[in-house]
């Protein structure tokens, strides 16, 4: 009994000793493993690198935030005039100071053609030119008031309109050393519209030209080639000053031109257009180039309805550039285009770039000779852009060749790689996965574009006029949020595998861009390649996605087989590059902490993982050079794409967003542009959309909600972004009734007009009649008659007399001479309403009138000005310099076959544009009190522009 107990106790002790020994061994092994893990623990730099560039939600979200911040900042720096440096050289400082003073004098008052202010500006420029060229014997000037300053031409073909114009351009010629070299024209216009002080349009251009003239006169050194400066008049209503220059003897001296213009109010002067690549490439020689051929494409496609003198010079066979201010358009042609709204930096940007361009070309002895060596290349339209004062340009044919190469090479390379990886089962993509991304995008676009955008439009129709970027940010956030939700849903229901998403999206995006590039390339191959000259961004976007696709497919193709990349149950799916899941976690915990936790909890699984097939290990080692490929693909595709899309979208929106006030068609275009820009901004992020962390999702929700609230409460018009209304006071010659007409989009003018004192006091009803394209004409009878001619009755503002006639038999050619007297009016129009009039004469007398059959077709001059067109002339516009002289007109006309009487009936319409006060018997009157009233009593969110070439129009019906 005792022995048995002793043996049992000994066994227990031995077992306890064994357990203690085993525990000690396990403890030693644990310590060894812990020490081994500590030795294998990556360095701090490695851990930071893995934390930042590992495919984690937080890393990706930080990348997205950094990308947006960087792109917006770079775009602001690139487009803002604030980053233009003032000159530091004393001579340039003096040039700027003198030019700024000149601009202040020019912009002292409104100065439309035919006004006293216009005459004052003309006289100032004449004196200033004479001052600047004193002592420079190689510089001469000409006042275009000579025997040949008057002419007639066809100004419109539909309907047929003939214009008569008297020019008083101021011209300067800087004689070049080499008369064989083609000369350069520098042009701007010194007139304004009646409602504007003309600072940006086009005082900046005029002041810049004076600065350049100042520079050359101080140099006392002749340039190699001749430079002609055209300070022209009456650009605003027909580009007439530029047209007049084409008839001046100095026109034959020049072949190239630089036109200075302004369609905004300040900012930076952008290269709008270039006639060809051969001249555009010389813009790289300016110090702060700012350019985009997007605007050139807009002009070529008729999206920009206003024109500049560039059009006249190009049609006259010249080659050159159009340099202009383009924003903000709110102040364009309004009283806000004044000195207060611009800056010396804006002036210096135009002046310095113009000076650099002209100075370089004037010294270049080869310029003009090289242009003829490769005419087919150099005369093609140019594609151009700038970034941070670097200028890039290429011809459309060169871009066409590059695009053809891109369209061919990448599809072959990526297509072969894609075919290889799929057929060898290295990368398996199901049909549902392949269509899931396009389906998700289409569903997202439908939800956002047709529900969100349309609801915004119904709540705040004109908000894009003042807040285009608010709408872009809101729509983009909602798009990205909805798309991400749809992707998560697809992944949840196993429609698409997460490991397929990124590369699959990149491949499909590259295909979408390929289709767009094919369309662009087809357009570049035609004769109208300028209509696609702003689509160069598509080439870049396709290249970025194609390169990323190539790298991703290479990563898959280097693996032996897709099955070797399967991992143990319970592990995360590896990246496309095969890197272990611990460096590609979807959660936001520290990688190394989680790694240690896994070793303690799943040691067996870790050992199992390390002993996986040699093929898998070899595949990992093979593609290890592609580690963290998500970050490489992101950096290739996203930042540059986002910047190009955002910056291009910003430029276009800033240029056209105000046009939705001008027509329903323009409104549709602006809204389409808004969602196109928003969708385009989302496209580069599609491959990574499912990896945004919860904080990024909250930010998107916040932007979407806040933006939607702002859309509902923010006013579309304010002081900085006013509603632009157009004014015209009409006088009916039948009853001499005066009425004010205001033109605007439907529903915008009535509330403003109802608050005018004259309307409230008279209880006049405002009548609005619908016009084409969403516009309306709101009018009311005004008690504030114009006082342009104090002491005159309204019925005497126009006098039309028939000074003689030479009637022939019925259906023969009739001849009538009439005299039109409209004091202080320098512009009248005759509206015939049909094609009865076959020839018009300005300045003729009945006695010297030649027979109709002896008149040559078109324009001719023989003491008088003749224009003949047997197909019929519908309108005749007349412009004269002397406001007190009359228009002497002769008409050759045929009665209609159904006319019962041999009578010609037409309307004479004369315009007055001068707002200068007038006096009678020591009493001062406002010339146009009705216009002063609308300016004074309108809300601060309203600005006023002219509707026609004058602010007052008097119409009288005439029978001869």
From Swiss-Prot:
SUPFAM superfamilies: Zn-dependent exopeptidases. Residues 24-33 have a biased composition (Low complexity). GO terms for molecular function: metal ion binding; metalloexopeptidase activity. It is a multi-pass membrane protein. It is found in: Vacuole membrane. Its EC number is 3.4.-.-. Keywords: Glycoprotein, Hydrolase, Membrane, Metal-binding, Metalloprotease, Protease, Transmembrane, Transmembrane helix, Vacuole, Zinc. Pfam families: Peptidase_M28 (PF04389), PFF1_C (PF22250), PFF1_TM (PF22251). Residues 587-605 have a biased composition (Basic and acidic residues). GO terms for biological process: proteolysis. Residues 1-57, 423-432, 498-502, 557-635, 690-696 are cytoplasmic. Glycans are attached at residues 148, 657, 736, 763, 803, 875, 921. The keyword 4Fe-4S does not apply. The active site is at residue 235. Residues 22-41, 587-614 are annotated as: Disordered. GO terms for cellular component: vacuolar membrane. Its cofactor is Zn(2+). Zn(2+) 1 binds at residues 189, 201, 261. Residues 79-401, 454-476, 524-535, 657-668, 718-960 are vacuolar. The chain crosses the membrane at residues 58-78, 402-422, 433-453, 477-497, 503-523, 536-556, 636-656, 669-689, 697-717. The record marks 332 as: Transition state stabilizer. Belongs to the peptidase M28 family. May be involved in vacuolar sorting and osmoregulation. This is Vacuolar membrane protease. It comes from Lodderomyces elongisporus (strain ATCC 11503 / CBS 2605 / JCM 1781 / NBRC 1676 / NRRL YB-4239) (Yeast).
